[in-house]
């Protein structure tokens, strides 16, 4: 349920944005700042960067114990918000909690998963990541008819689930991999042989190549995905000429397809067939999906828009984000696995914030087709990088992968 509440908070904000704008009379700048500092962008980036370091220094369970309390505080500010500072503060605090939570949960899932079923276990987080938005959108379609109070209720249901998840986490043990790595580190410290981890460690040698590879796969792809997440209702209605109700149905349908794709494609096939081939297919259909929007508006037909929703939904559930979660956990050693994931997630969300600011200006100055061409280019780059550079890690333990890549255990 971790990914459910994390992704749900992003979509709940987008679904109620117009209601909050009417209630608070927000200016364009205030709305832009809200989007840029939300859990879909900058605040989550900072949360991931800080959370990753804490995860490696104090343990996965340490972050797990406290990050949802931060999340709940932010949610309470939103639910009871009566002015812009409360709303903005709530968004920022929620984002910090989401960023730290994503890193801790994705790292822990991979470390505790059996080697032969790692993709299946990692896919469970992606399943919840798609389920959360689908449920939130359905709730919003019904509750938003009651105005802003409806959106407050949507946020409130996430508080209840977060509190339940936090209570369940108190019973969880620490990661065995992290515990073993920490004990070894403490032994080396006593012997004066330990090498401190810094970001310079991650930005040199094989680690730098891995960071660049993961950014090529995920950061570039996320420019497309963040456009989908924030602007698709607008695009469906203003470019695709769909009604608001049909647009909402398309959005819900895409998330339903996403969690079905996660379960039936990534979780079932990610450990049983070539990941390079699977990535190549799923990444390729994403390029085709976005190519639809480069066509003149009068050429667009309903079957094309449905094809876009299906292809994009399949990719969102079993494509770049799922592989990023898996590879980021596999390709770095336990000693700084969470720090590395926090760094790449930070880069991804910061660039998403910059891109989110740029998209409206690009559409206003050059038209949406030009923006769509850029998005197709981003999707193609991500597809090629992942297909060419896909590591062969299927069925191997994290320790095996570490020794193959570094030539020794990283202590």
Predicted regions and their residues:
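Extracytoplasmic gate region of multi-pass secondary transporters
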Residues: 13-14, 207-259
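Extracellular/periplasmic helix-loop-helix junction of adjacent transmembrane segments
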Residues: 14-46
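Conserved MFS/SLC helix-loop-helix module at the cytosolic interface between two early adjacent transmembrane helices
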Residues: 46-82
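Helix-to-loop junctions at the C-terminal end of transmembrane segments
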Residues: 48-59, 261-274
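Helix-breaking motifs and short loop linkers at transmembrane-helix boundaries and internal kinks
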Residues: 59, 80-85, 114, 296-299
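Structural signature of the two symmetry-related core transmembrane helices
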Residues: 62-76, 277-292
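Cytoplasmic helix-loop-helix junction between adjacent transmembrane helices
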Residues: 90-127
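Glycine-rich segments within core transmembrane alpha-helices of 12-TM secondary carriers
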Residues: 119-144, 161, 345-355
């Amino acid at each position: 349920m971790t990914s459910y509440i994390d992704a749900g908070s992003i979509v709940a904000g987008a679904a109620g944005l117009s209601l909050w704008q009417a209630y608070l009379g927000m200016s364009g700048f205030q709305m832009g700042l809200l989007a840029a500092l939300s859990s879909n962008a900058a605040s989550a980036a900072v949360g991931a960067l800080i959370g990753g370091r804490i995860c490696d220094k104090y343990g996965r369970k340490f972050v797990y114990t406290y990050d949802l309390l931060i999340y709940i505080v932010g949610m309470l500010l939103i639910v009871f918000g009566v002015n812009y500072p409360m709303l903005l503060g709530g968004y920022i605090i929620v984002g910090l909690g989401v960023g730290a939570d994503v890193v801790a949960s994705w790292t822990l899932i991979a470390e505790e998963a059996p080697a032969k079923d790692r993709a299946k276990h990692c896919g469970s987080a992606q399943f919840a990541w798609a389920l959360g938005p689908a449920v939130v959108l359905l709730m919003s379609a019904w509750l938003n008819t009651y105005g802003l109070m409806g959106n407050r209720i949507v946020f409130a249901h996430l508080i209840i689930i977060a509190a339940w998840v936090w209570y369940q986490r108190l019973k969880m043990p620490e990661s065995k991999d992290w515990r073993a790595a920490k004990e070894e580190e403490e032994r080396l410290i006593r012997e004066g042989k330990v090498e401190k981890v810094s970001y310079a460690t991650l930005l040199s040698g094989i680690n730098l190549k891995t960071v660049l590879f993961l950014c090529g796969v995920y950061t570039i792809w996320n420019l497309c995905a963040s456009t989908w997440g924030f602007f698709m209702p607008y695009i469906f209605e203003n470019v695709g000429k769909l009604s608001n109700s049909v647009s909402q149905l398309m959005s819900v349908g895409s998330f339903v397809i996403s969690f079905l794709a996660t379960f039936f494609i990534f979780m079932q096939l990610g450990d049983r067939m070539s990941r390079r081939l699977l990535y190549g297919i799923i990444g390729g259909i994403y390029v085709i999906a976005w190519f639809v929007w480069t066509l003149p508006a009068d050429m667009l037909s309903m079957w094309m828009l449905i094809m876009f929703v299906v292809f994009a939904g399949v990719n969102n559930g079993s494509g770049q984000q799922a592989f990023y979660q898996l590879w980021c956990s596999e390709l770095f050693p336990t000693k700084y696995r969470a720090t590395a994931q926090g760094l790449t997630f930070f880069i991804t969300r910061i660039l998403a914030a910059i891109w989110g600011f740029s998209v409206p200006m690009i559409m206003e100055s050059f038209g949406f087709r030009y923006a769509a061409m850029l998005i197709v280019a981003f999707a193609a780059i991500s597809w090629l990088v992942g297909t060419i550079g896909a590591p062969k890690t299927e069925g191997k333990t994290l320790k095996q992968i570490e020794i193959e890549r570094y030539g020794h255990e990283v202590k």
